[in-house]
């Protein structure tokens, strides 16, 4: 199974074999900021190792085609999102239904996913934003406009993630399905470093089109 995927290469592989993948469901997974500037085995001083491969495996073993890569350097969230939107466009133009595509992001990856939602402007795409909304985001990042089927997940003890209902209410695009889940692991921002069932399971349900 793939764990570290280079997005351009894997998209080309998918498109080459597109006739056999029209019924597949796809997850674009966008990891947190720490992993941008640290190796896979490096430990965060408070939260430990980012279990990137293990997170991807959880999605793969549940039948998803996972598209992901370890970002290097402190990438610009909006610029990186443009590349993801182009890859999504390639999939949809080749017969993949938008409602079978889910963009999942943790922490900074969640902000990249929010830019994907804004730029793609497709109400049929699925999104899961994890620990990636703060109370001052409306003021500091006014250009983000939610669009799609949106699930937000945040941890009660995490200062970097709160309810994003204000962003939803300030977005102009049609949002057919919107749900928020507050979890309570006591792990603060460290909960997203691991494939905990508290956020993995609802993410999988959402990506399967179960919006209840």
Annotate the PLM regions.
Residues 112-116, 138:
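Hydrolases whose catalytic domains are alpha/beta-hydrolase-1, hotdog thioesterase
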Residues 56-75:
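Conserved alpha/beta-hydrolase
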Residues 1-23:
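Bacterial Sec-dependent N-terminal signal peptides
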Residues 126-189:
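The feature captures the conserved acid-bearing segment of alpha/beta-hydrolase catalytic domains
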Residues 103-113:
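Gly/Ala-rich beta-loop-alpha elbow adjacent to hydrolase catalytic centers
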Residues 50-55, 73-98:
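Alpha/beta-hydrolase active-site loop
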Residues 21-58:
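Short, surface-exposed "cap/lid" segments of acyl-processing enzymes
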Residues 177-212:
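C-terminal catalytic histidine-bearing segment of alpha/beta-hydrolase fold enzymes
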């Amino acid at each position: 199974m793939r764990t570290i995927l280079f997005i351009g290469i894997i998209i080309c592989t998918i498109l080459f074999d597109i006739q056999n993948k029209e019924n597949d469901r796809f997850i674009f997974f966008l990891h947190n900021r720490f992993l941008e500037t640290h190796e896979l085995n490096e430990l965060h001083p408070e939260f430990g190792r980012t279990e990137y491969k293990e997170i991807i495996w959880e999605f793969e073993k549940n039948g998803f085609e996972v598209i992901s890569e370890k970002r290097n350097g402190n990438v610009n969230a909006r610029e990186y999102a443009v590349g993801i939107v182009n890859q999504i466009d390639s999939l949809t133009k080749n017969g993949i239904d938008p409602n079978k595509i889910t963009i999942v992001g943790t922490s900074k990856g969640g902000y990249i996913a929010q830019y994907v939602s804004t730029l793609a402007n497709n109400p049929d795409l699925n999104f899961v934003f994890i620990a990636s909304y703060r109370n001052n985001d409306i003021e500091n990042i006014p250009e983000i406009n939610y669009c799609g089927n949106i699930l937000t997940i945040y941890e009660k003890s995490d200062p970097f993630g709160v309810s994003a209902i204000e962003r939803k209410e300030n977005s102009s695009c049609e949002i057919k399905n919107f749900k928020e889940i507050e979890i309570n692991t006591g792990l603060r921002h460290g909960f997203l470093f691991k494939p905990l069932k508290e956020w993995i399971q609802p993410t999988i349900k959402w990506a399967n089109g179960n919006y209840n």
